[in-house]
């Protein structure tokens, strides 16, 4: 079973991880049948497909791709009343926009919280996932990737959690990272972060907020469902690495 796609070299990821990385582009108009010899030029080749695309999944499996992780993308409508999020924040807590001085503590938290992701062994080295997300949250605070980072804090100023947000268009925003600080679990901080993101969207006249998470992250799946978000799509991430036996 053949697979048609373009092989797009991922320069930034190649440099960051020190691994020659490519990603298959199935939407390319000039897509050609992929040969195993072409894939051998890269340490890692990534593919993201719709979870319902069984034919393409079978074709990728024959090329030596392995399932890495499933992904669920949610969409939350902003214009409707939302009692769950409207009552999420307490008067003893506040929401601030993260500033550069807070980057070190946020990097440390992100490196710890996001240690398990699709950037995992055996394709990536231990610590690579944490390094990636630490840089992500730094860029979110600086506004060079996501556009802002909101912090839920105690009245004392201690950070309880963070959520980064990106403008997609006039009507739509997307959550990049959402995490509770280590040691602050079990206090409903995830709900408070979703409340902060929801308020931010209302303030910026957004009509929809998108957020994706791993299928294995049951806590996040439950949080987004309780927040009123609906499943918009599901997908699989697959990798082919030079370590794989084909």
Regions found by a protein language model. Name each.
Residues 8-25, 68-71, 147, 167-176, ...:
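A conserved beta-turn-beta hairpin within the catalytic core of GNAT-like acetyltransferases
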Residues 29-38, 177-182, 186-203, 222-226:
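Conserved acetyl-CoA-binding loop-helix of GNAT-fold acetyltransferases
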Residues 40-51, 201-213:
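Conserved GNAT acetyl-CoA-binding A-motif
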Residues 117-135, 139-155, 159-173, 178-180:
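A conserved beta-strand-loop-helix scaffold within acyl/acetyltransferase catalytic domains
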Residues 26-101, 235-240:
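Acyl-donor-binding surface of acyltransferase catalytic domains
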Residues 19-30, 50, 178-186, 213-214:
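A short, internal acetyl-CoA/4′-phosphopantetheine-binding micro-motif in the GNAT/acyltransferase core
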Residues 52-67, 187, 191, 203, ...:
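Conserved active-site alpha-helix within GNAT-family acetyltransferase domains
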Residues 19-26, 87-127:
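Short amphipathic alpha-helix that is part of the acyltransferase structural core
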